[in-house]
Design a protein with these regions (language model features):
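PDZ/PDZ-like groove recognition
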Residues: 347-348
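Flexible, gly/ser-rich surface segments that form the specificity/activation loops bordering the active-site cleft
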Residues: 43, 92, 98, 221-225, ...
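Membrane-interface motif at the C-terminal end of an N-terminal transmembrane signal
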Residues: 35-47
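Catalytic histidine site
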Residues: 44, 54-202, 313-317, 323-331
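N-terminal Sec-pathway targeting helices
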Residues: 11-32
Length: 348
């Protein structure tokens, strides 16, 4: 009996030794297949359809809030280069400034699908305003507002004089009356601002805080337009690029994220760009724009793509479909610069 058990055990060991090389071979084949699939996925060029699905329209709705004693007392659309407050108002809706650019969905790691709603685009971020600078801006705006009130009063004197001496209510009279009404409303607005500025003291330590809402507009495979709220997770002041991510940290359905390889692509010759018509022109920009593939030519990482066909952030591909970079002005931001941006991602 013991001899029989011994023989059966010995036979089982021989069978396992015989199957062990076969198991190693199967494992090796599976591993090699996975590596080949990974290499093919990583380095396979984008098709025309994938190029179009890699982009979205990015909008930034921004404004400034003047905060005094923890309360918002004034809204400002922007701060001009001459430090003038642009369109100060007591209502937020009249101060929202919308800018457009092209956004590109990207993977954080080039060798695996790792988008999770990440997007790169071009956007100039203004410098933060400290309390001292905020008070200086308020003082200058207070002076400008008083000057504007004096100008409006002088204009209204002339307009009201014209209306008094002309009793015939013809078309010219009605036009002047409507213009005078607009100027009267503008003067009333400036007076309200003056009253507000008079209540602000330097000891109140007023602040000017920039607010922004980011949204990405993309299309499903059936052409239906969708939108996703975005948040900033990184930026490069030198390249004027921004890394964003969907609020839910998920990749939208139907998009085709691009992989940013660790070496730069071609910088000369014929290339292709994906652009939204009119997005690079302020008067034509719209979230309803459609993208198209446009031929362009590169020379030392510069392109000849007209702004009316593709604005900042438009992705550039080689003729074979390999991602090269994104546009900023007439330059192309390279893959290495974009990888530097990806490394600056802030952890939540």
């Amino acid at each position: 009996m013991r001899y029989l058990v011994f023989q059966l055990t010995l036979h089982g060991m021989k069978q396992r030794r015989r199957h062990f090389p076969r198991l190693k071979l199967i494992t090796l084949v599976i591993l090699l297949s996975a590596i080949i699939a990974w290499v093919a996925w990583s380095f396979w060029p984008s098709s025309a359809r994938q190029m179009k699905r890699s982009v979205a329209i990015f909008t930034c709705q921004s404004w400034y809030e003047m905060v005094c004693k923890g309360k918002t007392i004034l809204y400002v659309s922007d701060i001009a280069t001459d430090t003038a407050l642009v369109r100060p108002s007591l209502q937020q809706d009249s101060c929202v400034r919308t800018t457009y650019s092209t956004g590109v969905w990207v993977n954080s790691c080039f060798f695996i699908p790792s988008c999770r709603g990440r997007m790169v685009t071009v956007m100039t971020k203004p410098n933060e305003i400290n309390r001292q600078d905020a008070w200086t801006l308020i003082e200058k705006e207070k002076e400008r507002n008083q000057k504007r009130i004096r100008q409006l009063r002088d204009q209204l004197k002339e307009l009201n004089y014209y209306l008094r001496i002309n009793n015939v209510h013809d078309e010219g009279y009605n036009t002047v009356a409507a213009y005078a009404y607009e100027k009267e409303a503008e003067k009333a607005h400036c007076i309200r601002l003056a009253q507000l500025f008079d209540t602000v003291r330097k000891t109140d330590r007023p602040q000017l805080i920039r607010k922004a809402v980011y949204t990405a507009y993309y299309r499903l495979p059936n052409g239906e337009c969708q939108q996703a709220r975005m948040r900033e997770v990184g930026s490069s002041k030198q390249c004027q690029t921004v890394l964003l991510q969907t609020v839910g940290r998920t990749t939208p359905t139907g998009v085709a994220p691009l992989s940013v390889f660790f070496v730069n692509g071609k910088s000369h010759g014929a290339a292709l760009a994906v652009g939204y018509g009119g997005l690079g022109v302020k008067e034509l920009a719209s979230s309803d724009a459609s993208c198209s593939i446009i031929p362009t030519t590169l020379h030392d990482n510069r392109h000849d793509l007209p702004a009316v066909l593709g604005g900042d952030g438009s992705p550039v591909f080689s003729k074979r479909g390999y991602f090269i970079g994104i546009t900023k002005g007439n330059e192309v931001i390279t893959r290495s610069q974009l990888r530097g941006l990806l490394r600056k991602e802030k952890q939540p």
